[in-house]
């Protein structure tokens, strides 16, 4: 990618804080987050940038560092504040006094590759929401709190699940920090743990239902979304490592194949299996991330079962891949999807026009978002969409929901919401 010189905007020096942010959400499972086992390099390859921030989740910016609160805007580095905390899984050769803690992810590097293309007074605000080992068809649901987000044991994606509540709540929070902020893209990397389940074929429909719900839940913030619509925000869906395709060939075609050829829906698949020469993209397998002792670098080869991210090493991309091919291709996909608009071509901040009904927030503390909760046959079983039934049963058959009530009982369908007080005080509309 070639850098673009932008005219008509103030030049921002190294110590300047951005006036506003393009928001990039990072969601999915382990290959979307800091699972690269090679030594972090915060003084060189993994150096932070003052224009790249993240939403906080942990109580300190770095282990033992400055205090922060949930959803604060803090500096982004190589080990972001995802649902799963990788900050204590230190490399045995790490010098913690130099900030070489935890593992390496690609979020910082995606943002670095986008910086040359955005106005100089803007930054990138990353919203990390990944959880290793998470799936749509298996895994513990965990819990969600508006004060702390999804619990670390949350491992199930789907409409209404704690991981989804975390995703939508943090995305809203990032936009509400500043009425100038714009949701640019969602980088999604998920599917491995669904492939290992007998119910893997359900993953594509469950993903689509969640995608539709995410966009519906953000309609009240359309003005702060790319191109003025949550439906226009691209979902950039990344590939997985060669191990998964070699081990689960049929399942791979079903799960990852369902991300392909959906550009008309704003869903873009990004292949990572091999590089431009057809060589497998490097993983945490020791032979693929060796030590370079004379250069002072130690790879995944130096980790043991006391500190590796996973015992099955080729299931995760290496630190080098997360600095190179993965952010290269993800950032390019984002620019191909959103970069050919006036905001990028002119190098000026996009104009935020209030959505019909005046849903654009006027300040950080205002949330006038529209909550849309749906039950649609096309989106799969009711339970998968976050609904639960009492004193009865509900079953999807031939595109129709069939409800059977218990004798002498009155059945009810319920769905959790993340802001029950607003629903109670402001009311809503029911459409059948």
What are these regions (language model features)?
Residues 4-358:
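Cell-envelope and extracellular/periplasmic
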Residues 115, 125, 374, 429-431:
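Residues within well-ordered beta-strands of beta-sheet-rich folds
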Residues 370-372, 400, 427-431:
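Intrinsic-disorder/low-complexity, polar/charged segments enriched in Ser/Thr/Lys/Arg/Asp/Glu/Gln
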Residues 33-38, 279, 382-388, 412:
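Short, solvent-exposed loop/turn elements at domain surfaces
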Residues 94-104, 413-430:
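Extracellular/lumenal carbohydrate-interaction signature centered on repeated Trp-anchored short motifs
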Residues 391-412:
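Short carbohydrate-recognition loop motifs
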Residues 366-368, 396, 406, 423-425:
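Surface-exposed coil/turn segments at beta-strand junctions on protein surfaces, enriched
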Residues 357-391:
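Extracellular carbohydrate-recognition regions
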């Amino acid at each position: 990618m070639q850098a673009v010189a932008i005219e008509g905007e103030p030049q921002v020096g190294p110590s300047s804080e951005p006036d506003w942010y393009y928001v990039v959400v990072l969601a999915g499972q382990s290959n979307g987050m800091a699972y690269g086992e090679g030594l972090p390099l915060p003084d060189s390859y993994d150096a932070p940038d003052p224009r790249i921030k993240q939403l906080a989740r942990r109580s300190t910016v770095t282990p033992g560092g400055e205090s922060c609160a949930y959803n604060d805007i803090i500096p982004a580095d190589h080990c972001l504040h995802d649902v799963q905390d990788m900050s204590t899984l230190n490399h045995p050769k790490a010098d913690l006094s130099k900030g070489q803690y935890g593992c390496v992810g690609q979020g910082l590097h995606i943002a670095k590759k986008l910086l040359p293309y955005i106005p100089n007074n803007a930054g990138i605000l990353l919203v990390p929401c990944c959880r290793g080992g998470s799936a749509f068809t298996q895994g513990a649901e965990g819990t969600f709190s508006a004060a702390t987000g999804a619990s670390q044991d949350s491992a199930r994606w789907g409409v209404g699940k704690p991981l989804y509540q975390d995703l939508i709540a943090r995305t809203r929070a990032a936009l509400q920090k500043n009425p100038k902020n714009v949701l640019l893209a969602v980088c999604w990397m998920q599917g491995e743990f669904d492939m290992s389940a007998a119910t893997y074929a359900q993953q594509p429909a469950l993903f689509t239902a969640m995608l539709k719900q995410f966009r519906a839940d953000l309609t009240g913030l359309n003005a702060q979304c790319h191109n003025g619509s949550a439906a226009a925000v691209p979902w950039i869906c990344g590939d997985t490592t060669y191990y998964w395709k070699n081990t689960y060939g049929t399942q791979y075609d079903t799960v990852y194949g369902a991300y392909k050829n959906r550009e008309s829906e704003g869903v873009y698949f990004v292949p990572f299996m091999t590089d431009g020469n057809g060589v497998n993209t490097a993983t945490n397998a020791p032979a693929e991330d060796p030590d370079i002792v004379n250069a002072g670098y130690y790879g995944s080869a130096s980790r043991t079962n006391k500190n590796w991210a996973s015992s099955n090493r080729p299931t995760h991309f290496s630190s080098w891949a997360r600095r190179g091919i993965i952010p290269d291709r993800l950032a390019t996909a984002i620019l191909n999807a959103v970069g050919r608009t006036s905001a990028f071509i002119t190098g000026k901040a996009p104009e935020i026009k209030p959505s019909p009904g005046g849903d654009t927030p006027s300040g950080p503390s205002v949330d006038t978002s529209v909550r849309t909760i749906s039950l649609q046959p096309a989106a799969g079983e009711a339970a998968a969409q976050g609904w639960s039934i009492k004193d009865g049963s509900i079953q999807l058959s031939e595109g129709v929901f069939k409800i059977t009530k218990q004798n002498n009982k009155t059945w009810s369908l319920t769905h959790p919401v993340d802001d029950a007080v607003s629903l109670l005080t402001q009311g809503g509309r029911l459409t059948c």
